[in-house]
Amino acid sequence: SPVISFKNYSFQYRAQKRPTLTNINLDIYPGERVLIAGPSGCGKSTLAGCINGLNPCSNPGEATGELIIDGVDATKSSIFELSAHVGTVLQDPDGQFIGLTVGEDIAFSLENSCMPQDEMHQITRKVAELVKINNHLDYAPHELSGGQKQRVSLAGVMVDQVKILLFDEPLANLD
């Protein structure tokens, strides 16, 4: 069964007169990699925001139709509940940083779930190595290049082992 399923789904921001998304029908299955491409303003980020719960939880608007994310009805779920299923790397990673250091930022969700320190440090180091940021764990995020910041954001969602990874303009700052 699909891991993401849109059925006659529309979304309209409260501040707009017309829906940004209209009658979307789309099924994405486990293991598929899907690229949504189009010109600026066509609704790519809005679609992503509906998948990860930013729309309408953080960006007020009205949704109609059906959106199922990993078996969860997104139209009736909180952003917190959806974050257990969807990891998001934003175009501007500065908006995602929470910790004082790269290591703290990567480990943030693990610490929030009360994971034992030894296990948390081990997972953080392993994921940092995978994205080639392991030599910067003690740096502050603002000390990094744009591409390094993207790697930290990616590591921060990888530690959660979510089924769905969502990238909004992931190559914008990558070096």
Name each model-derived stretch:
Residues 165-168:
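Catalytic Walker B motif of ABC-type/P-loop ATPase nucleotide-binding domains
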Residues 66-81:
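ABC ATPase NBD Q-loop/coupling interface
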Residues 154:
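Hydrophobic anchor residue at the start of the ABC signature
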Residues 140-144, 148:
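Conserved ABC ATPase signature
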Residues 118-136:
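Conserved ABC ATPase "signature" region
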Residues 3-6, 11-23, 55-60, 76-78:
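A short, flexible loop at the N-terminus of ABC-type nucleotide-binding domains that lies
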Residues 52, 94, 100-111, 121:
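Short helical segment in ABC ATPase nucleotide-binding domains corresponding to the A-loop/adjacent helical element
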